[in-house]
Amino acid sequence: MTIDQLNQDCFCFSLDREALVHALETELGTAGVSEQLKERCASAFAAQPVFVGAEQLQRMAQVVQAVEAIVAMPAHREQVLATAPATARVAAVAAQSVFFGYDFHLDQGRLGLIEINTNAGGAMLNAVLARAQRSCCAAMDSLVPTRASVALFEQRLVDMFRREWRLSRPGARPLATIAIVDEVPAQQYLYPEFLLFQRLFERHGLRAVVADPSELHWRDGQLWHGELAIDLVYNRLTDFYLEQPGSAALREAWLQQGVVLTPHPQAHALYADKRLLALFSDGARLQALGVPEATRQLLLDHVPHTEIVTAAAAERLWAARRGLFFKPVAGYGGRAAYRGDKLTRRVWEEILGGEYVAQAFMLPGERRVEAADSSQAMKFDLRAYAYAGQVQWVAARLYQGQTTNFRTPGGGFAPVYSTVDASGNAFSHYGGEHASYIFLLDDGGAVHPLPHALYVALARQEALAPSLGGQTLRLADWYVRLKDGEPETVVNETYGLYEIDQQGRINVVKAPADAGWPTVAERERMRTLLFADKSTEI
């Protein structure tokens, strides 16, 4: 199967909910974090993975490095910082800034960098999610992240903060205290993640507090939280340039370089201002800046054309709006961003009166998932978490609507599973082919083989089964290794309950995990149908 086919036809669940709770409550978090996350972020985690080819992941890393190469150019830095706020013009900033988020759309193999964030959230949530993955079948065994890889990711997160300290304070004592700062943190949507970070730091011997910026004080050349001197601030504020009154102490500490602040205002100016996307997609400007041809071409191939909205271009942009997406230059989280084909004249006037860019619209990827009531198509984007030009982790975000959100049932962060085959083809395990065999089991003990293609069509609501209407059936999905095109061994069995309405539409029924298990007689009947009385053991 190809990557696109997997994203359309694989309905296997990879998220182990019990393991998720265990990771939140015991392994990474503290008691109560799981319930907080459930209350605040009910759609934080998707149950199914997104499949991405290794070639696309490699190109994402190359785009990250291309952006880094441009930002490192003195001419570019001078040009950008000349008009940036004072907090971005602080000289000799050594910290490189943690948690860059490079957000991509992937549409039928075409990859596009949609935006860059300099305080991307969700990294710890993805660490938790990775700990709760399970392999649904043998074909997935090599794709699910190992405990070792997840532990290494978490260690690298801590090492990243320690490196920020060493870069900013060469020769100083080791990092000791961290403040995780956001405005009214306990009211933030991702507050549970702040607690996970606090616990992560504490497990590695660092004192950590979660604080509102107004709780910080600048005195005696040191930033304080109460009586605790703060070495480093992990900055989750969307007050990117520390302009709000509540950020006054943090602003002064930053201007005086009395605290290590990461991410910091200079990084936002150099990377995240969306006007930079207009530069990255303009070959003439890149050439004038002295960007090498290979880097120019890489960016032109992977950054949708973007331009700054001006009054002079208003008539042309309005006429072309259906192919454009409009974003505020300092926006974040999809706020005040609009698809051009849905624009009203009133909103258009607001765009013209603000600071916006117009980006060529690029479709997000599509992942078909099995939700509570039916199969549905979800959009997805890809977020590459990066530090110092290196990708640390790639996650997907499943959603419905104009922009990414965590309000869609069945949506949220999803793990990215990738093949090692750069061609995008997947699964050649155990030296043979594999196939799924589907059976429906009724209350009378009868077993009905169901062609996999029909099952997919039913799950997608693209087909009906009126002859089965009005029943609740158990569904068995046997993942089978083939030999010479014939079933050889069952390598995984998945069961569930499905309700067929009077029109023949199939819907998932929420039920205990063992509710769909077959009887001994039913299982023997399936074995007979599958192997035609061969003696192969299951």
Give the role of each language-model region.
Residues M1-I538:
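Preference for protein termini
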